[in-house]
């Protein structure tokens, strides 16, 4: 097969154009074949054209090969000939050959890495990659394909583009109308979407509410928890879907018969999606861990999600940064990029959450600079919503939602809006509000002013207490 490939690289222009972008010297065994390919590649790189047999012989004469290497290449070049072959068959067989060689090389590399890792630390080859590189090596080998698609042609593909505008194939709608309005029909597959909130404001509540809504719309949801137990997450979904409060479940106010009846009623609905909840230790899983989980779920449960929820990004680990770093910008940005890449690969909508900084915990407004983890997160995310809850909003069972970033539309339209919240049921609900965003902003503004006044009063009270304590400590 090697002689056939090298021959057609020289004599078949159509074949060369098709396979050359995927060819590499590492796919040939050391010896005449690899050396001949290197001569071809050197000529192509220098002259941007396919070499002739004469050009190869001249390059061979000018090479620094040993006598044995020279003899082997000379013999192989003399065997290269223009023999007719079916183009489709030849391309397909070449693809198989390259895939097999890539897998062989990857397996050999993995064995080297594993063997090196098993040695005592002082005897290890420090230049050898860590075992953490093994998944990337294998994934790269498995991804090799002679795919002829080279991108979207703005002029030639305008019809398909228009159809995609009309059918919104990449959009996954929300149950809540206001979210559909600001995203123009829903979040898109292959995107990273983030909820921002302070401690105990409702990051997990928002994610659970979204999960329950997506379920009712018929989508499969994978909920990955990095802190809460699987049963705790499922209990929140129970409270939402079964219309019972968390207290009712915890205090035994609902019997097993009632619980079973409600669950079976949902089972009868043919439009209901599936939910899988999986917990990992805090800081103990990364995007590669989630890839493995997705593969297992597909094989063992025939489960392929449309929505992936990671609760939450800041307590995941990076699959690229293995050494602890105090540079949170680099680490969080890496995790965000890896999760977004996972969403693109799996064609899913990925939701996660982020913590706001301490300075914004009691604030009635939040902006991009208030993200606690890293400024690298908004640089990567496609859509970010801040969840704001003042004392007044909490008393009214409402939360103020603010668009921080949006690639779905102009974030300044409906930049802020109110959402009803039922904490006992872990649910966001629509509330009646005016059809224009300005009215919502005015309502939000009055609540913000009141909240700032309350916070000022609390700060003054705290300062007075500290002054009194300081006076008592004087000698």
Swiss-Prot record:
Keywords, in A-Z order: ATP-binding, DNA replication, DNA-binding, Helicase, Hydrolase, Nucleotide-binding, Primosome, Viral DNA replication
Annotated residues for binding of ATP: 197-204
Domain of life, source organism: Viruses
InterPro entries: DNA_helicase_DnaB-like_C, Helic_T4, P-loop_NTPase
Stretches for region Interaction with the helicase assembly factor: 456-475
GO MF, any single term: hydrolase activity
Gene Ontology biological-process entries: bidirectional double-stranded viral DNA replication; DNA replication, synthesis of primer
Protein's job: ATP-dependent DNA helicase essential for viral DNA replication and recombination. The helicase moves 5' -> 3' on the lagging strand template, unwinding the DNA duplex ahead of the leading strand polymerase at the replication fork and generating ssDNA for both leading and lagging strand synthesis. Interaction with the primase allows the primase to initiate lagging strand synthesis and fully activates the helicase. Loaded by the helicase assembly factor on replication forks that begin at discrete replication origin sequences, as well as on forks that are created during recombination.
Assembly description: Homohexamer. The homohexamer is a trimer of asymmetric dimers. Interacts with the DNA primase; this interaction forms the active primosome complex, which is composed of 6 helicase and 1 primase subunits and expresses full helicase and primase activities. Interacts (via C-terminus) with the helicase assembly factor; this interaction brings about the rapid assembly of the helicase onto ssDNA.
Descriptive protein name: DnaB-like replicative helicase
